Swiss-Prot record:
This is Leucyl/phenylalanyl-tRNA--protein transferase. Keywords: Acyltransferase, Cytoplasm, Transferase. It catalyses: N-terminal L-lysyl-[protein] + L-leucyl-tRNA(Leu) = N-terminal L-leucyl-L-lysyl-[protein] + tRNA(Leu) + H(+); N-terminal L-arginyl-[protein] + L-leucyl-tRNA(Leu) = N-terminal L-leucyl-L-arginyl-[protein] + tRNA(Leu) + H(+); L-phenylalanyl-tRNA(Phe) + an N-terminal L-alpha-aminoacyl-[protein] = an N-terminal L-phenylalanyl-L-alpha-aminoacyl-[protein] + tRNA(Phe). PANTHER family: LEUCYL/PHENYLALANYL-TRNA--PROTEIN TRANSFERASE, LEUCYL_PHENYLALANYL-TRNA--PROTEIN TRANSFERASE. GO terms for molecular function: leucyl-tRNA--protein transferase activity. One of its GO terms (biological process) is protein catabolic process.
Length: 234
């Protein structure tokens, strides 16, 4: 196994099965963040992740972290909070603000550079990247964004500036996603936070099989239309 250098003149990727074991899932470097290349990557179960100043690195880890939406873990305290939630939740109202929030609300630094923000904003304008926003009155207090692949949603990042804001985004999105035929959320790599929400690890080959099936599925044509998903009780 060896790390592949991508060409700027081709959007082709090597097979994910050729990814390194250490660091887990590192497959290739280089290329660019053009919409065509990003979409090709997601269609093959590959995603970019790299530090500022480093070359673009492309990953497909084994195992893969996923969340079955119906398995979302909601604690008793979160259920009580959501029942009296002060938040309003929308979809695709403020993609730019959400990705900027994800980029800026990281004490330990972020991989979401200016180039990444611009790249995913282009994907959003093309109808492939989407955001969930959480508002306290007119203030954006949390949210999440990711890339749609049919009935599979590739979650990229989330942020929270008030109590339970990002959890509210995920809870409301999962409910809406399930109701309209959504099947699976890709979490990429398991961490303590995603594990606490019900995410689990599956073999990469299983994830790729699910991806190949689900990316051909269809949600309702109006699913990603900007709209309000949840309003606080009066």
């Amino acid at each position: 196994m060896r790390l592949v250098q991508l060409s700027r003149h081709s959007i082709a990727f090597p097979s994910p099965e050729g990814a390194l074991r250490e660091p887990n899932g590192l497959l290739a470097l280089g290329g660019d963040l053009s919409p065509a290349r990003l979409l090709m990557a997601y269609q093959r179960g590959i995603f970019p992740w790299f530090s500022p100043g480093d070359p673009i690195l492309w990953w497909s880890p084994d195992p893969r972290a996923v969340l079955w939406p119906e398995s979302l873990h909601i604690s008793r305290s979160m259920k009580r909070f959501h029942k009296r939630s002060p938040y309003r939740v929308t979809m695709n109202y403020a993609f730019g603000q959400v990705i900027e929030g994800c980029a800026s609300d990281r004490e330990e630094g972020t991989w979401i550079t200016r180039g990444v923000v611009e790249a995913y904003h282009r994907l959003h304008e093309l109808g492939h990247a989407h955001s969930i926003e959480v508002w306290r009155e007119d203030e954006l207090v949390g949210g999440m964004y990711g890339v749609a692949q049919g009935t599979l949603f590739c979650g990229e990042s989330m942020f929270s500036r008030m109590e339970n804001a990002s959890k509210t985004a995920l809870l409301v999105f999962c409910d809406e996603f399930i109701r309209h035929g959504g099947k699976l959320i890709d979490c990429q790599v398991l961490n303590d936070h995603t594990a606490s929400l019900g995410a689990c690890e599956i073999p990469r080959r299983d994830y790729l099989n699910y991806l190949n099936q689900m990316r051909l599925g269809r949600l309702p044509n109006n699913f990603w239309v900007p709209r309000c998903l949840f309003s606080p009780q009066e």
